[in-house]
Amino acid sequence: MASTYLAKTYSGSGNRQRQTISFWMKRYKTGAGQVVFSSYYTSSYYAYVLLGGDDRLQYYNHNNVNVETNRKLRDVNAWYHICITLDTTQATEADRLKIYINGVQETSLNTATYPAQNAEVKFGDNNLHEIGRHDGGSYFDGALSHFHFVTNTAYQASSFGLTDATTGEWSINTAPSVTYNTNSFFFFFF
């Protein structure tokens, strides 16, 4: 997927305070900045979910939101489930944005600048959204599956995955109970 992407410009805004981004990914290349999902309005107003050059997962939004894991995602043979939940209405700062990898919340963070209470992010706004790149570059080099973007609800990772009783591994929930609202979507991709 090193030069392919999907793009959509929304005509109106969805809920920008409560959201969920959930997807499964397999990386083909590490050590280079790769954007999985982005929202772009201008060079000053944008957001993205990025795998940095150091292979850490990062959620960035132009209005001083920057949350990056300490964990590095370097295994090109593994599928990773990523779930990012946003609820800026929460009183506790760390509850406003959570990152889960394979069903486990990442609490050891390299950077943790959370959204202000009741802030709105660029994802879900009436601007360009892209899966697989940001503003014409930083292409994601890998495979994606079961990609959900949901506005209006901050679902937990357990809505999209479950622990296999036989193997003990985190696996895809192929029939999640999810409500898709304005500007929400689901792509199977596999």
Question: Where in this protein do the model-derived segments appear?
Answer:
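Extracellular glycan-recognition modules
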Residues: A2-Q58, Q90-E93, T153-S158
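Surface-exposed loop/edge segments in extracytoplasmic proteins
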Residues: Y45-A47, N64-T69, V104-N110
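Short hydrophobic/aromatic patches on beta-strands that form ligand-binding or substrate-lining surfaces
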Residues: I21-K29, I82-I84, I131, L144-F149, ...
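Extracellular glycan-interaction patches encoded by glycine-rich segments
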Residues: V65-N66, E120-L144
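Short tryptophan-centered beta-strand motifs in secreted/extracellular beta-sheet-rich domains
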Residues: F23, N77-T88, I99
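Extended recognition patches within non-cytosolic domains
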Residues: M1-Y5, A91-E93, K98, V104-T113, ...
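Beta-strand-rich, repetitive solenoid scaffolds
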Residues: S38-Y40, A47-G52, Q58-H62, T85, ...
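Short surface loop/edge beta-strand patches of beta-sandwich-type extracellular domains
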Residues: M1-Q19, V65-R74, R133-G136, S171-V178
